[in-house]
Structure formats: C-alpha cells, structure tokens
C-alpha cells in the first residue's frame, strides 16, 4: 500500500498567518522531522531520538546529565526565604545533587505574580542579600540556578508602566494581557538587550550557572504591530528569541537553561535544539507523574526530559518517585527536611545509581514494551536500550502483577532489579515475558537486562 504524509501550517485559513514577499524575497518554513521505519512504535521512537540528538546544540549538560534540585514542586511552592533555602541546600548536597535551582518568588516580598519583570532580589525574603544563599550553595559544591520568566512583565511592574508599547505584544493599539502579564516582543532589539542585561547581571552578581526559564502565558494569535499578520509576529518573535539564546550561549557556553512553560509547554525542537533540559510537567501527584514518565521520551530525548522526583511519605512512595526519574533526568524536589533516615538513604541510593547509568541513558534509545500508557493503565513500562544493557522501569499503579513482553527473550543472560537494591519483589522470565509480582499496588521497580 501507499503512505501519504501531509505537513501544513502556518496558513491564513487555519492560523491567520500570511507574509507578503516583495520581488526577490524568499521565505522558508520551519523544519519538521518525520521517522519512516520498518516496524512500529519502538523503531520510530528510536529514529526520532537519534534525529533530535543530531539537530541539538552540542552542550556539556546533555553529556553529563546533571542532577538538579529545585525548591518549587511540593516544596516551597514559590515562597523562598534565606532560612528555608539554607537548610534545603544542605539536604540537596547531602542527597548528591549537582545543581540547586531557586525557583519562583525570589524577586518580590509579597504576591509576586503580577509584579515580575525587574528581576531584583526581595530584601524581605533575603535580609542579607540573595548572594548569601548563592554563596552557601557554592560552599556545598552545588552550582546555583534561578527561575526567570524573562519574556513577560507583570501588569503591576513599575518598569512596565514606564516603557513604550512597542516593547510588548499589542493588538488594536493596546497591550495584550494574559494571566496579569504583558508579553515582551523580542522583535524589538531594545527588549533583547534589556533581557540580556538581566541574564548577565545575575550571572556576574550571584554566580548563577543555571536558569529555569518559565512561560505561564500565551500571546494568543499574535501582535498586529509592525507585522504583515498577527501570526507572523509570533513566528518572528520566536526566531528572535532563538537567536537571543544562541548569542547567550556563545558568551556563556557552560550555562544551563531549562525550558519550562507551566510545566511541559513549548516542548518543541525549535527550543530544544538550543536548550538542554525540558520541564515535562507541573504535576503534583507522583502517581500521575508516572504516566508522563512512561510516555514522554516519545517527544523529547531521555536526557532532556526533566522529571520531578518529590518523595514525602513511606518507602514505596520514595521508590515510585525515584523510578519516575531514573531513565530521564531526575529533577529533585519535595519536603526533604521531613524525610527520615531511611527515606534519605533510599533517595541517595537512587541518585547514586543514576550517576552510574546516566551515560547509558544519554546514549540509549527509548522503547515502550506495552505501547503508550493511559490514565487507566494497570501497568506502565518504559525502557532505554543502550549498547550493552537495557534498562526497564515498571510501575503498577492499579495492580500487583505486571507482564511485560521482552524482545529477543531467548538472548537474555540476566535480569535483575537494580533499584531498590534489596529488590523487594518477585520476578521471572516466562514465555518471553518479564513477569513481576510487586509487594503492593502503587509500586515501581527499575530492572537491568543483560544480553548474552
């Protein structure tokens, strides 16, 4: 039979996009990648993963797969203070994290949502200055990170009300407002310079080596200012944004920038060919996070997929959380000051193991032995095939037994549970399947499969 593939957009009819070309001008659409393979989902996912790695900017973060602690999710939730940060930094260092990212709230003493935009430390939160916190992180061997939403200014930001309208996305002579924010228009070179100065200042003043760049808004169908069509203003904004990032990395090649947008938005390789890490969710429930962990490597390379790990209850809860992140990029958070000794040790074990296998995660390709999981799935499974070994995460959110089909089962030399190290479950290979008996529902284990 025949296979027909149609790619379209942006168009005027569907997207309100058009661009007028003068004689001699040309226009090239954004690139799109498609995998054409023999086989099904897994060969296609492998091919797309290799393609994404090939088009991506070479960077040390995606070579090292740094472990990041972020103080937001199920942790401080945007309410930082010096006292809180210092104690959490100590815990992050003890766990074996390599970066510490101070998330939202560091720039305002009160309700900060609609006042973002100047990116200056809040003296009420940090009486001795933000540098005290950054210096403490550095003293513990951690590289320091800060949260930014660099493309917006809140409607209550004093600076925003002093700036001309052409700094912002506008329609019908007024600034577009979404979620109490104005959107900066990166087509304006003054905007790009201002934002670059912010980044350079934070790097120079605080020793920041990591930015989590969020985007909790949408500019809708674009701007009618200085553009053929509103939608083309969106395209031009993103082209300028990408160029802005490329210029930053030319001057700061070791800087790490995480791509975030209310969790996992803007997860495209226009952004991810430049930025090394992608936030995949703002999901606060670790059980639902497993559904994301089991599927997300279809859309992002495993080493770029930041997955929240935020344990705060019993041992199986800790294990489930850690397994969520083990074959992606574990992104540590949670109320770590409440963890007992056993839970801390279980977390340390997971992070230490991740450091042992992360080069194989970096070089391997994802596979989905049960296909894509759904919210109703009783069993979830996701794996990474590396050159020598295969790693497989298995979750049982609604059952205690899992049956996972294995490719080339007759060639398997050994299967073992590598997290947790005590195993604490039953398993065997039977009729070409890995059969797992968990100690309870809502359990997870990480397996290593070695071939003959």
Regions inferred by a protein language model and the residue ranges of each:
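N-terminal accessory beta-strand-rich subdomains and adjacent acidic, glycine-rich linkers
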Residues: 1-57, 287, 366-369, 402-451
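Conserved, mostly hydrophobic/aromatic
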Residues: 24, 137, 195, 214, ...
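Active-site and adjacent substrate-binding regions of carbohydrate-active enzymes
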Residues: 104, 108, 122, 190-269, ...
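Active-site-proximal substrate-binding groove within the catalytic cores of carbohydrate-active enzymes
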Residues: 241-427, 433-448
